[in-house]
Regions:
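Intrinsically disordered, low-complexity basic tails and flexible linkers associated
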Residues: 1-87
Length: 87
């Protein structure tokens, strides 16, 4: 199993804590995210909402997720792609 998948819940909790997210924000935007695949240093994450949600998450949480994934897993130069379930 990949380290990102293995530690996904921990990664999300760290982002929540370090960025002082409310439970509502966390449960709305981050908790529903799931790791689709990890290839080399690219993490593909499924956003189970419409395009608006994908755009918002990409703008607001992409960098915090990249930094936290790198810190927790040791993955250098981590890149993130967000996709919708139908992609």
């Amino acid at each position: 199993m990949n380290k990102v998948v293995e530690k996904w819940d921990e990664i999300l909790q760290i982002v929540k804590t370090e960025h002082d997210l409310s439970d509502v924000s966390f449960n709305t935007w981050l908790k529903p995210l799931t790791v689709y695949e990890v290839v080399a240093n690219v993490v593909t994450i499924i956003v189970p909402s419409e395009q608006v949600g994908l755009n918002y998450i990409s703008k607001k949480y992409k960098l915090p997720l990249q930094v936290t994934i790198s810190e927790v897993t040791g993955m250098q130069n981590c890149a993130i792609n967000f996709i919708l379930p139908e992609d």
